């Protein structure tokens, strides 16, 4: 059995457990939906992913405080599925919601930076590089400021985020920023 089959089997078992334990409509059920959606997205089934994310969203928005990090993560993941389906306006709206949440959280700067880079990518996909250049530059500047902020905890999460963001900065020609955040990432990994 390949990874894909195992992942979908695990998601189905989790869905069955939610039903067996009568957890439908709970935060736990929403998290199971979110995890199943992530499996769908990972294996190129964005339409199914978006349906499962929508299930999670309706529960999370009903039961979680508006600034809960889980909502921010959901909006980010849901936006990625929208991008895969070329539903760019919805993706941008979800990324903006994620930014509002993540930027208000303690230690949320790295995650907010990722979201700004995702917004830049959406703008390019929707409008083209030339037409979106001003918006992209603005997003890159915000992401750079957030990642280079001295208040960031220089931990494994920060290293991971920097490592993941560096290629996007390189893609847009921000080579010095890419080099600096990659250096920071490498230093943290070497220490641990």
Feature map (PLM): residue ranges:
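Structural signature of alpha-solenoid helical repeat scaffolds
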Residues: 21-24, 63-66, 107, 153
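Conserved alpha-helical positions within TPR/SEL1-like repeat arrays
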Residues: 27-42, 69-84, 110-124, 156-170
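A detector of tandem-repeat and repeat-rich interaction/domain scaffolds
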Residues: 46-50, 59-64, 87-93, 98-101, ...
């Amino acid at each position: 059995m390949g990874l894909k089959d195992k992942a979908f089997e695990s998601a189905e078992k989790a869905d069955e457990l939610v039903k067996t334990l009568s957890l439908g409509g709970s935060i736990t059920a929403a998290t199971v939906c979110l995890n199943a959606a992530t499996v769908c997205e990972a294996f190129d089934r964005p339409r199914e992913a978006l349906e499962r994310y929508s299930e999670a969203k309706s529960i999370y928005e009903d039961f979680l405080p508006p600034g809960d990090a889980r909502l921010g993560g959901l909006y980010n993941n849901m936006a990625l599925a929208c991008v895969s389906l070329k539903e760019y306006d919805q993706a941008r709206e979800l990324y903006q919601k994620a930014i509002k949440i993540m930027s208000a959280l303690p230690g949320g700067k790295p995650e907010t930076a990722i979201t700004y880079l995702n917004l830049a990518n959406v703008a390019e996909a929707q409008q083209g590089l030339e037409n979106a250049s001003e918006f992209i530059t603005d997003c890159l500047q915000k992401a750079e400021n957030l990642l280079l902020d001295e208040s960031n905890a220089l931990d494994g999460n920060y290293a991971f985020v920097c490592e993941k963001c560096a290629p996007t900065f390189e893609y847009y020609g921000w080579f010095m920023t890419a080099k600096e955040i990659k250096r920071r990432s490498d230093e943290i990994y070497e220490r641990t």
